[in-house]
Amino acid sequence: VGRGFWAFRDVQEKKWDSPYKDWFHIDFGGNTDRNDGFWYECWEGHSELVKLNLHNPAVVEHQFQAIRGWVEQFGIDGLRLDVAYCLPIDYLRQLRAFTDTLKPDFVLLGEALGGDYNQWMGPDKCHSVTNYDCFKGLWSSFNDRNLFEIGHSLARQYGPEPWTLYKGAHLLSFADNHDVTRLASKLTEPRHIPLAYAILMGMPGTPALYYGSEWGIKGEKGACSDDELRPALEQPEWNDLTGWIAKLAAARRNSPALCNGSYRNVLLTNRQIIFERKAEGERVLVAVNADGEPYVAHFDAGCGLAWDL
């Protein structure tokens, strides 16, 4: 929470006499650079973001009642949990158990930057987390002329082997977002932009588009500001990329294999990737050629039986 949060303001005023002092991680024997007269734990060194004590039942109850109010008053269908990797696992389990009672299809989406996503995702934790592992490969595989990177990342996460990490899960997949440089600024060759979106819409998971990127707008993450990533846009700028992404989204939406099917690499080179998504009664092949020249691939494509989605 911010320093202006009412319970924290009460602690600033009443110190150890505040009934909310245990809502935070506080040491009255210390101080801060803001001279509060006590030390408090903050998020990753940012003193304007005060860390709540999620082991305190009163804090948890306050949050749960707020969530209940949002559901009853506004009909929300889920929560995106910022920096979910910082949350205690026991708290995540409590949150999941509570929200399951509000709506059977209420979704918890957690932000996770790395590590084993199963730490925060599962039947008693978040339904899904952000797939930063494959986000990086979506652009660097093209820039480095190394489609092995994204191919191996997807196979590690979703491949047919019994040891793969997230088979059956729906990680949130993205090419850019509010915290990272936009895809159109990241890729060295603009012609690779539609190819990256083809992989995004074809790979397992739940694809997400960051506003404006469907038009191909650029934006660099700054050292001190994210303003360039988050412009105020007046009107849509529909173009060929927008139309291409709309076609990809429609193909995915109408395909059981692309939505829920298995994953298998069929062909993989530095500049080409073909992977298979398969569900009962449907087999889809996603083929991407990052080279500037045509490529002849030899594999079982089901000639005479296939059609272009």
Region locations from a protein language model:
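Asparagine-centered strand-capping/turn motif at beta-strand->loop junctions
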Residues: 287-291
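Substrate-binding/active-site clefts of carbohydrate-active enzymes
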Residues: 1-69, 73, 95-101, 118
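Structural preference for beta-strand elements that scaffold enzyme active sites
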Residues: 76-80, 105-109, 129, 170-173, ...
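Substrate-binding cleft of secreted/luminal carbohydrate-active enzymes
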Residues: 197-200, 204-218
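The substrate-binding groove and active-site-proximal loops of carbohydrate-active enzymes
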Residues: 45-60, 77-86, 139-145, 179-189, ...
